């Protein structure tokens, strides 16, 4: 059991038989009445986001999530396939279950698959991934004086803002938590 006063972004809780991840939370103490915690929760199985208000100090069961290293194999358009590196069992997940992680998945990439009661409910990506730029506008000499940025499409289909000196074919390090460009590699 965990108290609502101990909520943190990324925490997983069990509510009404489902697993939810805390996306946002806010402790509210009105001038009149008891304090409460307003939160946004993402259902780990379906990807649906709900808003829920709890009394401050309310005890909620914490979801016991198992992490297993798996390799991303391929996508058939709707479902994403992963293989357990120890047992060679294959697991499929929908895009809704993966959320924003689909923008950073590369074939043969090792990731942590999250399991609840033996069923896959999501993935945990490495903090940084290296991806190749497949499309961006060419940089023009003298562009860098303003220190601006331009959009670039990566090999996974994700679009990120990059500095003007980045060209097609460059490999970039991307932060998977924020989706921001870090550096050229």
From Swiss-Prot:
Its main location: cytoplasm. It comes from Pelotomaculum thermopropionicum (strain DSM 13744 / JCM 10971 / SI). The keyword Cytoplasm applies. The gene is efp. GO terms for biological process: peptide biosynthetic process. InterPro entries: Elong-fact-P_C (IPR015365), NA-bd_OB-fold (IPR012340), Rib_uL2_dom2 (IPR014722), Transl_elong_fac_P/YeiP (IPR020599), Transl_elong_KOW-like (IPR013185), Transl_elong_P/YeiP_cen (IPR001059), Transl_elong_P/YeiP_CS (IPR013852), Transl_elongation_fac_P (IPR011768). GO terms for molecular function: translation elongation factor activity. Involved in peptide bond synthesis. Stimulates efficient translation and peptide-bond synthesis on native or reconstituted 70S ribosomes in vitro. Probably functions indirectly by altering the affinity of the ribosome for aminoacyl-tRNA, thus increasing their reactivity as acceptors for peptidyl transferase. Belongs to the elongation factor P family. GO terms for cellular component: cytoplasm. It is found in: Cytoplasm. Pathway: Protein biosynthesis; polypeptide chain elongation. The keyword Cytoplasm applies. Keywords: Cytoplasm, Elongation factor, Protein biosynthesis. PANTHER family: ELONGATION FACTOR P, ELONGATION FACTOR P (EF-P) FAMILY PROTEIN. It holds the Pfam family Elong-fact-P_C. This is Elongation factor P.
């Amino acid at each position: 059991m965990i108290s609502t006063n101990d909520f943190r972004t990324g925490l997983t809780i069990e509510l009404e038989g489902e697993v939810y991840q805390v996306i946002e939370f806010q402790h509210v103490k009105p001038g009149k009445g008891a304090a409460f915690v307003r939160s946004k929760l993402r259902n780990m199985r379906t990807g649906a986001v709900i808003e829920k208000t709890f009394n401050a100090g309310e005890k909620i069961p914490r979801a016991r999530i198992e992490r297993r290293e798996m390799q991303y194999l391929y996508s058939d358009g709707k479902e994403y396939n992963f293989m357990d590196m120890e047992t060679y069992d294959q697991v499929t997940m929908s895009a809704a279950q993966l959320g924003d992680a689909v923008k950073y998945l590369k074939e043969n990439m090792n990731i942590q698959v999250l399991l609840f009661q033996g069923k896959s409910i999501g993935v945990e990506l490495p903090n940084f991934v290296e991806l190749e730029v497949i499309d961006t506008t060419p940089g023009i000499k003298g562009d860098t004086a303003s220190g601006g940025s331009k959009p670039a499409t990566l090999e996974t289909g994700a679009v990120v803002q990059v500095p003007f000196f980045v060209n097609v074919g460059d490999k970039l390090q991307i932060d998977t938590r924020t989706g921001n460009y870090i550096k050229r590699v």
